Amino acid sequence: MDLNGKCVLLGVSGGIAAYKMANVASALRKLGADVEVIMTKNATQFITPVTFETLTGHKCMVDTFDRDFKFEVTHISLAKKADVILVAPATANVIAKMAHGIADDMLTTTVLAAKCPKLVSPAMNTGMLENPITQDNIATLERYGFTVIPSESGVLACKDVGSGRLPKEDVLIEHILHAIARPKDLAGLCIAVTAGPTQEPLDPVRYLTNHSTGKMGYALARAAAMRGADVTLIHGETALQPVKFTTDVPVTTAQQMYEAVTSRFDATDVLIMAAAVADYRPAAVANDKIKKKDGDMSIPLERTPDILGTIGPKKTHQFLCGFSMETRDLVENSSAKLTKKNLDMVVANNLKVAGAGFGVDTNVVTLITPDGTRELPLMSKADVADAILDEILKRRSQ
């Protein structure tokens, strides 16, 4: 996901975290963004304009009446040029000014003139942040359509421990991506995505599971959220970071995933079952650890609930997309699932194909619908996710 052709305006005010914005500016440039920076006068006490000018290739604006550049009404031109504005760190002072329409410097004047999405990341001492006046000002900004990025907690520069830290750079960048990286063509849709493995306990120590890492499902959830959908991510145990802008529903067993999916199904417009749900579980779970003995041991297994098999025949308006992992007869086996479970689409992949399957960042899939099949080339899982969502959007509009 990139920001080619997008202009990001960073507003840096006078907080100790101002230095972090150099990393943000650099990362945004690597994503292809055109980055402009406006600093308050106090911000220049923490980091110099030259740093931002070197990283962005643009003059860093501070003084509204600076004449050392080609004439134009700069606070208006930047307000029109920006696709998104991020004010970070946003001090209590700057937040108060923006909340009350005070435009007494280049930053606040530009923010007031801009009509693009505006993000604000408060960063200050805990006492200042929690002061009712600051909280009222933050609420006012939200009421006017600003997106407020919550502060993080930890040890502050003043050695206090509490909320008020500027979020990590990747969090700020993710908010920018969410605001402008993709058209919001999935806005208004409630999409549920399942991801990762399930774990079926044998005793308090052991369980049956599979090799799924959840990467494909997480990529789908992130892509859908970036495109404006209301996303619920129902997932088994993974080592992946939570997907921002989604409702996170962790589960462990196939039974829990069944309950999580079916309880939300009526309110769901699109269900994408990317999870590797166990087909079988131990028929009985031992209360104590099973001790090793001489000889072999057999474990009786029983079927787990078939999630798509249960809800497929009951669907009304929902679009159902299943996943099929095969090692042979890919299209034949996956097409049978499409018909048997009353699905709208099956995403099939062959574990034996190089670059596909578990634990890698790429995939090779075949999209199977009632109209036929379409094999996609080797792509990143992020690109595969967008291709799947494109197909779903197209078929829902038919």
Question: How would you label these PLM feature ranges?
Answer:
Residues 1-119, 125-398:
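A cross-family phosphate/adenosyl-ligand binding-site feature
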